[in-house]
Amino acid sequence: MERPESAIDLAHLRHMTFGDRALEAEVLRLFDGQAATLIGKLSSADTETVIALAHALKGAARGIGAFAVASAAERLERSSDGYERECAVGHLTTAVREARAMIGDILQAA
């Protein structure tokens, strides 16, 4: 599957981890697990919980430079119920999948 190289802004990640590769790997592992858990909870969550999950994911994504995930999470956070929310969940799921794939590549290369 093709994914944008910008799924994670590596310069931002390195800045946030002070260039410490071990810390970078740890932060990426934490985000990877958190993102998988939060995405898994979205389908059965009520509106209030969806907003809280999207907000949590938005903050975590910004911290590692996964700006497409953060943007998609913010879109979900602001979405209305129904079709708009379904589309926002789809965009977020795709962005998370791309970020997690890049994380896998980064961790495998480390």
Annotate each predicted stretch with a short phrase.
Residues 12-18:
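Short hinge/gating elements
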Residues 37-52:
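Helix-loop segments that flank and shape redox-cofactor active sites
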Residues 52-54, 97:
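N-terminal cationic amphipathic segment used for targeting or macromolecule association
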Residues 17, 42-46, 80:
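Hydrophobic residues in alpha-helical segments
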Residues 1-11, 22-41, 60-75, 82-110:
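Amphipathic, coiled-coil-like alpha-helical segments
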